[in-house]
Amino acid sequence: MNQVSDEAKRNVALSLNKYGILKFGEFKLKSGIMSPFYIDMRIVQSFPEAFHNIANIYAELLKDLPQDVLLAGIPEAGIPLATAVGYVTNRPLIQPRAKVKDHGVGKLIEGEWKPGDKVAIIDDLVAKGDSKIEAIERFKECELEVVGFFLLLDREMGGKQIVEQAGYTLEAAMTITEALTILKEENKLSADQYREMIAFTRENQ
């Protein structure tokens, strides 16, 4: 796995907190589990500083990826992320449609590509991993080879292992534990808050 710098991790963690992308409270996850925190990556593009820091950490994560590998974001949160990462890394981008049009050319995946091309999937985070497995099917239908997933955050809920058991690599720039630890060190979280978040993470691994 490519290592990203401590400075990049710190910049991202502080941005997630500063702009309310990482929220604290009581939230119901897709799995039905109640969580004391939630990461709302769908608002990232509204905050240029956060968007910049996040695009840069993806660039570090992808630095050893061959230049001919296409990037693709998973709708919806992954699309603006992949677009920003493609721009800062000068990489070609394709985009799976959330819903196939019934007019025009009716493409499953927008952009220039051909069967046999390799694709790196960009997404925001992984929790249980089921949505990642589902996403692969669209690319397989188009005979594109998925080389792996590249994400900002691993929520450490077993999703990484599920994806890897399916035969795909998954690299995250940082874990939720790393992000929470940075916020505690920067006095953005109290000791009690930190203990609660870490306990939840450990209980749901």
Task: Tell me what each language-model feature is.
Residues 1-122, 126, 130-205:
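PRPP-associated nucleotide enzymes
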